[in-house]
From Swiss-Prot:
Region of interest: Disordered: 25-64
Assigned keywords, A-Z: Cell cycle, Cell division, Cytoplasm, Septation
Entry's Gene Ontology cellular component terms: cytoplasm
One Gene Ontology biological process: FtsZ-dependent cytokinesis
HAMAP family in the cross-refs: SepF
Quaternary structure and interacting proteins, as annotated: Homodimer. Interacts with FtsZ.
Biased composition (Basic residues): 39-51
Organism (species): Natranaerobius thermophilus (strain ATCC BAA-1301 / DSM 18059 / JW/NM-WN-LF)
Protein's name according to its UniProt entry: Cell division protein SepF
Source taxon at top rank: Bacteria
Subcellular localization(s) per the UniProt record: Cytoplasm
Amino acid sequence: MNFFEKILVFLGLAEEAEEEIIEDEEDVAPVNNSTFQEKKHKKRSAVQRKQKNSDQEGDSVVPLHSTKNTQGIKIHLIAPSKYEEAQEIGKYLKSGFPVVVNLEQLEMETAKQMIDFVSGTVFALDGNLHKIGQQIFLFSPPNVGIDGAIDTTGDEFFDQKTYEEYE
């Protein structure tokens, strides 16, 4: 598992890959080819019946192991230089993409307004807001789960006490 995959697993955006179990050749009994084909056909028919039944039942059945998504989840990284870029962040969130926002280039008042706007968008979408650095935030839509936490105690930016002093 490479470094990027480990980060995605940590953030809950991907699942850990399972190791394959390889059987010894000695343990496997020889199989008659025609018997194998018959069993394969019967098994396929049973699977097709289950799929038809599950299609009729709706989405109440959830697979235990998800299939690997070849596209992956795109995380947008944005360092806005003006307040007008808040709408771009909102569009990404509405489209289902998580966004990491670095507010270090903005004035304090503009950064507050940006946080207010994007936080409102996240709230309306039932998403999540995570502070991951001094002026760096992770905004995620409801379809993206975030596990873990980063300790930002002692950081005054966007601290509720500090935030109230500016009002």
